[in-house]
Amino acid sequence: AIDKILNGEDVDLSDAVFVYELEPGEGAENGIAASKEGAVILTNLKCYLLQADNGVKKVWETSYKSVGAKESKEGDETTGGGLAWGGGCSPSLTKDLVMFTDNQDPVNLIAVDMKTGEQVASMPVIDELPEGTQVSVENSAIVYDDGEGTVSTIVCNWFGAGSAKLGEADNDSSI
């Protein structure tokens, strides 16, 4: 259907929309990325590579652990974190890797092989903070692949990235 759409042809999409059902308790809230390999979906429990042509084909799935949402306490001057359960971020892609965070304590950056889904690396990020500092990764990691074997990433802490007084008159979302 996509080739026909790109060629400007009229297309009946009723046979081109497919559904992949997740397990009970599993949800995909904001973790979606696409490449020529397929769609990478990050749920609160797993990372998937799906392809769709005449139905949905699961190429691989990789489980990971997460602690879910993180909340501010009453009286805090900043908002909390955890806009979504699970990794909290959308997957970042290179030609060979899918990278995402797990929102554990400390937060880990996980890299899985794009072709197989096998976890090839995991390391703590944003872990050299004072005791009790909350961390919530809510944006995709910035990824740079130099094409010669070095992949660099930047992961940001978004916990408290907005004003808790947003609902009050004369306030905005800045800290």
Give the ranges of each region predicted by the language model.
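Extracytoplasmic/lumenal domain signature
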Residues: A1-E29, A33-I175
